[in-house]
UniProtKB/Swiss-Prot annotation:
Gene: FDX1
Tissue expression per record: Highest levels in the adrenal gland (at protein level). Also detected in kidney and testis (at protein level).
Residue list for modification N6-succinyllysine: 66, 158
Residue positions, PTM N6-acetyllysine: 66
Protein name as catalogued: Adrenodoxin, mitochondrial
Residues with PTM Phosphoserine: 63, 177
Amino acid sequence: MAAAGGARLLRAASAVLGGPAGRWLHHAGSRAGSSGLLRNRGPGGSAEASRSLSVSARARSSSEDKITVHFINRDGETLTTKGKVGDSLLDVVVENNLDIDGFGACEGTLACSTCHLIFEDHIYEKLDAITDEENDMLDLAYGLTDRSRLGCQICLTKSMDNMTVRVPETVADARQSIDVGKTS
């Protein structure tokens, strides 16, 4: 009974959060209800999360699951790095300390457009559907193309190995656009 309640709570939180965090919580909630990730503990019947680390989960961070990504910076320099399957492109830039000025100013909260990236056609076609929230932020980005997405919303998959993404020549922080609108 507590497992079902915990799963419902995780799914409800996923709807509120949206984006990658929401998708993760929804997935966790679905798994919690079906595989017993939440189990009753003690005489009071309180739910406590239990987690077992399988060999396959530990292997996720192995070099086999590392994806090579090439970023073409604003000045035309190519920055090549690796990221883990499931990491967002914002995570890849931050974790590898790539020198992309102002990238990810809002830390992936969909409050700016500084992680705006332009994708190759064959990669763009395989990306998950864009959300309304991401689309709203992209509307405020400079250099918008029909292959533009926000790096905080794109998670690496094996099919993206060796992809190249381009950082637009100019950057707009949507938070500044909103602030300017409020003061005038």
